[in-house]
């Protein structure tokens, strides 16, 4: 409560009780329970599970305040590993219990389950979604510009050249929304910069 988390190129900062309050700085150390890297690129708070997800240039970290320690996820030789350590953006999809993320150089988008035991030495399996030109149900474009979760738990993914891909909470295939000059209520361009949701 009443906390601000700040990611920087030199550690993770936790500010308590406003600008004149206390603060803590978390940096990588020799301990396995420290943050995976000092270069923090994005943050996502999981309100359902009271934990912080941290994107860095060297993998993912999950911080649980009640335990005051980090669980780190990096690439491994296994097929269900995360595809790259240099993570760029995060989204916690609270209803589906997934963490969505993009990386700096690998195409497409990725997700993994946020439901796993912190004491486990194995990270949760990661899923990678990439455009397949012969599969119309694959993601529309590998250039991901923005992604959000709506209140129903569906994920909307904006792309650089091919509109919006939509992934239902209950399905595993993408449907697409693209510019159609015959549809006056549709997208006005296939180049998507940002997506947001409205509250009633």
Regions found by a protein language model. Name each.
Residues 1-200:
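Carboxylate-rich, polar loop motifs that coordinate divalent cations or form catalytic acidic clusters
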């Amino acid at each position: 409560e009443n906390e601000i988390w700040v990611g920087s190129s030199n550690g993770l900062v936790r500010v308590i009780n406003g600008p004149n309050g206390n603060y803590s700085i978390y940096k990588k150390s020799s301990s396995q329970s420290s943050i995976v890297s000092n270069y923090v690129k994005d943050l996502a708070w999981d309100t359902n599970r009271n934990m912080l997800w941290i994107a860095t240039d060297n993998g993912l970290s999950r911080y649980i305040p009640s335990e005051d320690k980090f669980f780190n996820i990096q690439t491994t030789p296994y097929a269900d590993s995360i595809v790259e350590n240099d993570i760029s953006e995060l989204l916690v999809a609270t209803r589906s219990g997934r963490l969505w993320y993009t990386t700096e150089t690998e195409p497409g988008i990725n997700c993994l389950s946020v439901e796993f035991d912190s004491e486990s030495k194995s990270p949760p399996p990661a899923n990678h979604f990439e455009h397949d030109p012969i599969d119309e149900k694959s993601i529309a474009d590998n250039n991901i510009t923005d992604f959000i979760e709506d209140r129903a738990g569906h994920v909307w993914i904006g792309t650089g050249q091919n509109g919006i891909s939509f992934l239902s909470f209950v399905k595993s295939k993408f449907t697409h929304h693209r510019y159609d000059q015959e549809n006056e209520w549709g997208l006005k361009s296939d180049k998507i910069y940002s997506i947001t949701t409205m509250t009633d």
